[in-house]
Structure formats: structure tokens, C-alpha cells
């Protein structure tokens, strides 16, 4: 049994597993998950290094993927929904363990190497430089991040990881490793995948109109690994498509699931 922390919603119907992005946690999907739970069994996963799941010494996509695979069974293949980093994990799960994945949904991520991860490094540095011993209220932590992270929505997202631990605060994610291994998080393990075939199941790609993570430049790689994919661009959305346009995201997901 996998040691990953999960939240389970719903009691009947096909199973849908949600994988969050960098600095996220399973509960980021809580609102969407509850809405789907009327017709599906929903699993919200804390990926390694995040939330209440284990925090290994290094970040490795295939190890993360293997940990998610331990949650699943070939007798009950699932729809996997992954955003950003979780999108890469979802793609790798479909490629390396296709018997576990009935359908795949990728939210604003492509099967490519991303060279520019500087923005995420800024977030890591800001969180690590925050003196949590001097923080008594969450509002003080928010103020401490404001200069480095001026976007209030992003700050709110990051601060969801701030947890009370007795009389003090701590970050509920593996900041030292995530900060050090950002290049690996931007990577795509092409060499390790040479022994695998393309995933031949149905794939829905949900791209943010204002994001540059899914572009025409990446279409050949998407087609190579996922020949049955269909791309939907969500108007007005940036990278966090599911939180910026939740109703549109949910409608596209329900249609794909056949609800």
C-alpha cells in the first residue's frame, strides 16, 4: 500500500484521481472533487514532498510516479487528472503503467523540458527567508512574502502550505529539496522512456489561454506520446486553469468522463 496521503470522496461510479502541481496538495482539488463525487469515487493525492506525504531526499519523477501507482489497481483503472508537475506525473503514469489508467486529463503541462524555472525559485527563496519563529499570525506571513510575491492569489496558494505545529509554524512541504531540484521538476525523463510505447487511451488536454506551458511548439511531443489527445484551450485562464476558471474546467471534465 502506498504511503501517500489521500482524501477520498464519493462512494460510487468510476474512480478519478487528482494530482496537484508544485507547492500544491490534494486539498487544492477539494471543491472540484466534491462536485464530481456525486457520480464518481474521487481521490485527492498529496504527492511526495508535499502536504502530509513522505518527504524523500531527492526529487525523481519516476519515483513519484511509482508511489502514485501503488494507490491504483489494474482491476479498477482510473481517470487521472494532473496539473503542472502533477500533469507530468499523470503522463508518466499513463506511459509506464497504462493498465492503471483508463483516461488521462492533463492541465496546462506538456511532455517536454522547461528551462525557465526562475519564478518558482523566487517563491522558494521567499518562503525559506521568512522567519517563522517571529510569525504569530498567518497575516504576518502574508505580509512577509508580499515584496517577493506581489500577486495575492499566488501568495494565498503558497500560504496554504503554512501549518501550525504546536506554538510555531512550519511549511508542509519539502522546501529544501524542491528548491534544490527545480531543474529536475522542469525536466522530462526522455531517456528513461525509450523502452516504453505511447499511451493509446483517450487524453484531454486543458490549456490556459494566457499560459505558455502548452504551445504549438510542443504539439509534436504531445502527439508522439499521446496520439489520441484532444486539446481544449480555456479562455481567460493562465497556468492555474482549474482555480481560475473552475466552472469551465469542471464542464470539460464532466463531458470527457461521460457524465
Features from the language model and the residues they span:
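Conserved alpha/beta-hydrolase catalytic His-Asp/Glu region
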Residues: 133-189
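Conserved HGGG/HGGXW glycine-rich cap/lid loop of the alpha/beta-hydrolase fold
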Residues: 5-54
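Conserved alpha/beta-hydrolase "nucleophile elbow" surrounding the catalytic nucleophile
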Residues: 20-22, 82-87
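Flexible "cap/lid" loop of the alpha/beta hydrolase fold
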Residues: 92-95, 100-137
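Catalytic histidine-centered segment of alpha/beta-hydrolase-like enzymes
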Residues: 237-246, 250
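Short beta-to-alpha linker loops that shape the active-site pocket of alpha/beta-hydrolase fold enzymes
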Residues: 46-51, 110, 237-238
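Conserved serine/cysteine hydrolase catalytic core
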Residues: 167-225, 230-233
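Active-site loop/oxyanion-hole signature of alpha/beta-hydrolase fold enzymes
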Residues: 2, 34, 43-81, 89, ...
Amino acid at each position: 500500500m502506498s504511503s501517500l496521503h489521500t482524501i477520498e470522496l464519493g462512494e460510487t461510479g468510476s474512480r478519478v484521481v487528482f494530482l496537484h502541481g508544485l507547492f500544491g496538495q490534494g486539498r487544492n482539488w477539494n471543491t472540484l472533487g466534491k462536485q464530481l463525487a456525486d457520480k464518481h469515487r474521487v481521490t485527492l493525492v498529496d504527492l511526495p514532498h508535499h502536504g502530509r506525504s513522505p518527504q524523500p531526499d531527492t526529487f525523481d519523477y519516476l519515483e513519484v510516479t511509482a508511489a502514485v501507482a501503488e494507490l491504483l489497481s489494474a482491476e479498477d483503472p482510473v481517470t487521472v487528472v494532473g496539473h503542472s508537475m502533477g500533469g507530468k506525473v499523470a503522463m508518466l503514469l499513463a506511459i509506464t503503467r497504462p493498465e492503471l489508467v483508463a483516461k488521462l486529463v492533463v492541465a496546462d503541462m506538456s511532455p517536454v523540458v522547461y528551462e525557465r524555472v526562475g519564478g518558482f525559485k523566487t517563491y522558494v527563496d521567499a518562503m525559506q527567508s521568512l522567519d517563522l519563529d517571529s510569525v504569530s499570525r498567518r497575516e504576518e506571513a502574508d505580509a512577509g512574502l508580499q515584496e517577493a510575491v506581489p500577486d495575492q492569489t499566488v501568495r494565498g496558494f503558497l500560504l496554504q502550505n503554512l501549518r501550525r505545529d504546536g506554538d510555531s509554524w512550519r511549511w508542509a512541504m519539502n522546501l529544501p529539496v524542491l528548491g534544490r531540484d527545480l531543474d529536475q521538476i522542469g525536466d522530462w525523463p526522455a531517456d528513461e522512456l525509450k523502452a516504453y510505447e505511447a499511451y493509446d487511451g483517450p487524453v484531454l488536454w486543458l490549456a490556459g489561454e494566457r499560459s505558455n506551458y502548452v504551445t504549438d511548439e510542443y504539439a509534436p511531443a504531445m502527439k508522439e506520446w499521446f496520439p489520441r489527445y484532444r486539446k481544449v484551450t480555456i479562455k481567460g485562464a493562465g497556468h492555474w486553469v482549474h482555480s481560475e476558471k473552475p466552472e469551465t474546467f469542471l464542464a470539460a471534465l464532466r463531458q470527457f468522463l461521460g457524465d
